[in-house]
Amino acid sequence: METPHCQRCGGRMEMRVRHGGLRPVCPGCGFVHFANPRVAAVVFLAEGERILLVKRKVAPEQGRWALAAGFVELGEAPEAAAIRELKEETGLDGVIERMLDLTFNEADKVIVILYQARAVGGILAGGDDVEEARWFTREELPELAFASTRRAVAAWLDGSLYSAASSRAGSSRNTSSRDSSG
């Protein structure tokens, strides 16, 4: 059990059947803890025939290249998280143009939202938890981290990334591959 004490009264949680499943419940105040998935916001930014990638400085996938991404913070809209992560990891200011994809990673219990963005300012430089941020052409692509990055780049390479977004609008896909933050 990941929540040993009640966040409301501090009492010891017990596993009980509630709302159709086995969940941590506080016998003192009746609070039920729901283990909800985390949400990751991922930014796909292309300029001409180049895409922006970041080299990860930390695990998971340390040393590999990925799209700028990170977890949505409490009270933050996913679009705002995407723009924040873009700035933190690349130094670039951006605007969201549209959502491209929505997937659920069953293994890590993460909802992954992929956004198309456009750079509107800033100076390209690696920051936060990345070693480097840089533009890559199709011919220069490095080894990629995360299934969501590999899917997005593959769709960009075959020309289906932007058309796929309109056909997937309102739908989501379930993935089981490891993809904890983008």
Ranges and model annotations:
Residues 14-17, 92-100:
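A short coil-to-beta-strand element that immediately follows conserved catalytic motifs
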Residues 46-88:
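Conserved Nudix-box catalytic region and its N-terminal flanking loop in Nudix hydrolases
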Residues 36, 101-124, 149, 157:
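Active-site-adjacent beta-strand/loop module that shapes the phosphate/pyrophosphate-binding cleft
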Residues 27-52, 71, 102:
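Conserved N-terminal beta-strand and adjoining loop/helix that marks the start
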Residues 15-20, 36-39:
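Short Cys/His-rich "knuckle" micro-motifs
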Residues 6-9, 26-29:
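Short cysteine-rich clusters marking metal-coordination/redox-active sites
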Residues 3, 23:
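Residues immediately within or flanking Cys/His clusters that coordinate Zn2+
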